[in-house]
């Protein structure tokens, strides 16, 4: 994740690369669907930085997606797009 600031009080700096994680049921194909969802929302996904991991019991999957955001609005749009998916239970 690339977040740059010469002053830590500034928060996120744009443009930049950011990482989101979303968790949901393992049998729903979220590892493929969520990156496509962000692309459809106009978010620039870094395809080679998409990863996922199943829970120890195999019931859930955590999908980690790196994306580029030009502005805070674009960053918020990416979060909202994932949160709005009916199968996503949590986002980080």
UniProtKB/Swiss-Prot annotation:
Lineage: superkingdom: Bacteria
Residue stretches in coiled coil: none
Gene3D superfamilies (alphabetical): 3.30.70.260
Listed InterPro entries: UPF0250_YbeD-like (IPR007454), YbeD-like_sf (IPR027471)
Spans traversing the lipid bilayer: none
Pfam families attached to this UniProt entry: DUF493
Family matches, as HAMAP family: UPF0250 (MF_00659)
Family note: Belongs to the UPF0250 family.
Protein name: UPF0250 protein Smlt4048
Annotated organism of origin: Stenotrophomonas maltophilia (strain K279a)
